[in-house]
């Protein structure tokens, strides 16, 4: 740089600095003059107040003296000038202190108290924006849960007006032990058949099985427009393909978040929420009665894997406008504090993958795509080839990749039959089976039933999931198989390899404070979960009388001025064999329960009508009643009793095979109950000659 250029630049900088100094000096002078004028005016006000007090004192002693109009006019001008100056400097939300010289601090505190009252009013209005609702409105909505209350899973809810209805989610749940041959449970759709003519659509919050698992079974009976985000519809579409329902994809409606749409008489907006599956949503449902917020399943994750946190701004937007009713996830209502972020799992995965000497086998929910994604990233980091095994895991991962939710290099993946070609320390297997399902890939690996993979002593098996209530025994069984194979198992002793997808108490409080509902219906969970969520809501200022604890089948009506139970409808579960995708009749399940708990007795009798006696060809057998050595005495005892029964039977019974069967069955049933104090299943065939 030349000297001239340097001088020019210095001159320019000097000029700019001078201008800046002049501006600052001017601003300071204006501020000083303004402050001086304000102080002078305040002093004039004080002088005026003192003069007024003095004049008043003199008037009391000289009542006949005429008032000095000259002084009044002079000081009125002074006071008006001061007021004009105050008005010119007044800012909205700011009150100036006027009574600075009143005796003691009385005047000063008066002004401060006005400020306190103003702020209290603002706070009350802010905490209760639902006061803006029209309490004279006759409009109301009716809420009917068909699943998801009094249980974990199976979520389904109807929101309706006299002319229109929407169904929120259609989920499945797992059976408890004792429902033999039943793989999944789905809600009873009877009520939907009753109101089918006014159902405007099915609204999906997210793609977990407990929210979408019943959709194909519903569409086999009833079809409605199905609204959801791309991942939800992608996974539902895959289910429809498995059930031969591909033609019903024409009912799918892809929605965009933050874009309200009309569905029947409702205006619905999907709001982004964080959960243990990507593309989850809360719902803002605007009705004539008021706004309803349904959180869906949620947690408030500030550092999610995809860097897309909960849309708190949009939730707060509706909270400020005024929300009539909040329906919120209660699953983790007993858990204090906050639920850790999904991203907190990364360090534990890093350590486990780094230290693993053999194959790494990671099992989790197939829908937890971010969990799978993180595991695959660490597999790639430590130069492992990835084999994805398990139909649902492969399907979900493929859909997420095709839709662009995750990006992974295809060259890192291999097929299950290629695993044996690589050294063990270069393999990551991502698989299903975290719930101990007997048909899952992990279970079959652990029991040597898988076609390509068996567990080895040097394997590290990471089960990155918590057992769903009802699945504890199944998970324990697969753990036992793995440990017998001498595999290293990382499960619940590693607290940081699994985090919940549901909000704990502090997140529930934040949701309540953001939404500030007038009425509250805690949802998603057993009764103890919603009851605990109720207490959290009360602590956040929701009046107890404005909270109702629902159970499946309850019908609650909500309007701007009231919430009340108005009825109960038939609800329950339908049983499904997941291998055949067919429903199982309730009577079949009951028969299986009888057989399992009390055993079976089989009687095939041949009767001589004339002699009223059993023929020698009659056969008897039992299963699950007595041991083999005790069966003959039992049969002999039953035969003897039947001989006596037949002798006293009339011709009408003996000549009618159906009546003879019923007569025989009732006798055997009573005899066995008398002996064993239980009612086994009885199979009876009767023939008379």
Curated annotation (Swiss-Prot):
Its main location: cytoplasm. An RNase that has 5'-3' exoribonuclease and endoribonuclease activity. Degrades 5'-monophosphorylated ssRNA and dsRNA, considerably more active on ssRNA. Association with RhpA significantly increases the dsRNase activity. Degrades RNA substrate with hairpin structures at both ends with low activity, but presence of RhpA significantly increases the activity on this substrate. Stimulates ATPase activity of RNA helicase RhpA. Involved in stabilization of mRNA but apparently not rRNA. The modification N6-acetyllysine is found at residues 132, 138, 321, 335, 395, 509, 545, 632, 647. GO terms for biological process: protein homotetramerization; rRNA processing. Its cofactor is Zn(2+). Zn(2+) 2 binds at residues 210-211, 297, 524. Belongs to the metallo-beta-lactamase superfamily. RNA-metabolizing metallo-beta-lactamase-like family. Bacterial RNase J subfamily. SMART domains: Lactamase_B. One of its GO terms (cellular component) is cytoplasm. GO terms for molecular function: 5'-3' RNA exonuclease activity; protein homodimerization activity; RNA binding; RNA endonuclease activity; zinc ion binding. Residues 1-88 are annotated as: Disordered. Homodimer. Homotetramer; dimer of homodimers. Interacts with RNA helicase RhpA, might be a member of a minimal RNA degradosome complex. It comes from the Bacteria. Catalytic activity is regulated by the balance between homodimers and homotetramers, with homotetramers being the active forms of this enzyme. Acetylation allosterically regulates the homooligomerization state and hence the catalytic activity. It is found in: Cytoplasm. Coiled coil: none annotated. InterPro entries: Metallo-B-lactamas, RibonucZ/Hydroxyglut_hydro, RMMBL, RNase_J, RNase_J_2, RNase_J_b_CASP, RNase_J_bac, RNase_J_C. The first 132 residues are not conserved outside of Helicobacter. Important for protein stability. The C-terminal domain is required for homooligomerization. This is Ribonuclease J. Residues 9-24 have a biased composition (Basic and acidic residues). Residues 56-78 have a biased composition (Basic residues). Binds up to 2 Zn(2+) ions per subunit. It is not clear if Zn(2+) or Mg(2+) is physiologically important. Keywords: Acetylation, Cytoplasm, Endonuclease, Exonuclease, Hydrolase, Metal-binding, Nuclease, RNA-binding, rRNA processing, Zinc.
């Amino acid at each position: 740089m030349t000297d001239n250029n340097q001088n020019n630049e210095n001159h320019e900088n000097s000029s700019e600095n001078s201008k800046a100094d002049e501006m600052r000096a001017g601003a300071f002078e204006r501020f000083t003059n303004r402050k001086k004028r304000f102080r002078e005016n305040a002093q004039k006000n004080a002088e005026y107040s003192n003069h007024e007090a003095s004049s008043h004192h003199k008037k009391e002693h000289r009542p006949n003296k005429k008032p000095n109009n000259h002084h009044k006019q002079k000081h009125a001008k002074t006071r008006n000038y001061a007021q004009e100056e105050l008005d010119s400097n007044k800012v909205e939300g700011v009150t100036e202190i006027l009574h600075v010289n009143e005796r003691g601090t009385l005047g000063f505190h008066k002004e401060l108290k006005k400020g306190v009252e103003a702020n209290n009013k603002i706070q009350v209005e802010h905490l209760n924006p639902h006061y803006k609702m029209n309490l004279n409105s006759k409009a109301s909505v009716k809420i009917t849960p068909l699943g998801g209350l009094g249980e974990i899973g199976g979520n389904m809810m109807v929101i309706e007006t006299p002319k229109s209805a929407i169904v929120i989610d259609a989920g499945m749940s797992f059976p408890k032990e004792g429902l033999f041959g039943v793989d999944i449970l789905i809600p009873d759709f009877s009520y939907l058949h009753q109101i089918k003519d006014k159902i405007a659509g099915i609204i999906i919050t997210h793609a977990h099985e407990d929210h979408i698992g019943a959709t194909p079974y519903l569409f086999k009976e009833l079809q409605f427009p199905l609204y959801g985000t791309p991942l939800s519809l992608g996974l539902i579409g895959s289910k429809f393909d498995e059930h031969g329902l591909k033609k019903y994809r024409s009912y799918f409606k892809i929605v965009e978040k933050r874009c309200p749409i009309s569905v029947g008489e409702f205006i619905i907006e999907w709001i982004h929420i964080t959960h243990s599956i990507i593309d989850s949503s809360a719902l803002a449902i605007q009705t004539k009665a008021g706004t309803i917020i349904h959180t869906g399943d949620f947690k408030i994750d500030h550092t999610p894997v995809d860097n897309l946190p909960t849309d708190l701004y949009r939730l707060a937007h509706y909270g400020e406008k005024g929300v009539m009713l909040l329906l919120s996830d209660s699953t983790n209502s007993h858990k204090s504090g906050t639920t850790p972020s999904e991203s907190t799992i990364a360090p534990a995965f890093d350590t486990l993958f780094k230290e693993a000497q053999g194959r790494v086998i990671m099992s989790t929910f197939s829908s937890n795509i971010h969990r799978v994604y993180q595991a695959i990233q660490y597999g790639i980091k430590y130069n492992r080839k990835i084999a994805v095994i398990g139909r649902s895991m492969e399907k979900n991962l493929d859909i997420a990749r095709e839709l662009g939710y995750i990006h992974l290099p295809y060259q890192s993946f291999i097929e299950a039959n290629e695993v044996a070609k690589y050294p063990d320390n270069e393999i990551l297997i991502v698989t299903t089976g975290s719930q101990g399902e007997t048909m899952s890939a992990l279970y079959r690996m652990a029991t040597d039933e898988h076609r390509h993979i068996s567990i080895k002593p040097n394997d590290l098996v990471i089960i990155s999931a918590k057992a769903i209530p009802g699945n504890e025994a199944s998970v324990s069984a697969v753990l036992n198989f793995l440990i017998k194979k001498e595999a290293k198992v990382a499960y619940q002793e590693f607290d940081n390899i699994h985090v919940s997808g549901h909000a704990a108490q502090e997140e529930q409080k934040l949701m309540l404070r953001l939404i500030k509902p007038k009425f509250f219906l805690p949802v998603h969970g057993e009764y103890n979960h919603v009851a605990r969520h109720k207490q959290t809501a009360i602590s956040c200022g929701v009046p107890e009388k404005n909270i109702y604890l629902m159970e499946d089948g309850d019908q609650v009506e909500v309007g701007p001025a009231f919430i009340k139970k108005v009825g109960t409808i038939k609800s329950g579960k339908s049983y499904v064999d997941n291998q055949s995708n067919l429903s199982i009749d309730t009577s079949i399940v009951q028969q299986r329960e009888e057989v399992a708990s009390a055993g079976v007795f089989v009687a095939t009798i041949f009767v001589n009508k004339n002699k009223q006696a059993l023929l020698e060809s009659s056969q008897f057998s039992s299963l699950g009643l007595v041991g083999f050595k005790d069966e003959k005495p039992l049969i002999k005892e039953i035969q003897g009793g039947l001989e006596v029964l037949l002798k006293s039977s009339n011709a009408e019974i003996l000549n009618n095979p159906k009546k003879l069967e019923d007569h025989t069955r009732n006798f055997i049933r009573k005899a066995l109950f008398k002996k064993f104090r239980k009612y086994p299943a009885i199979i009876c065939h009767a023939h008379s000659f």
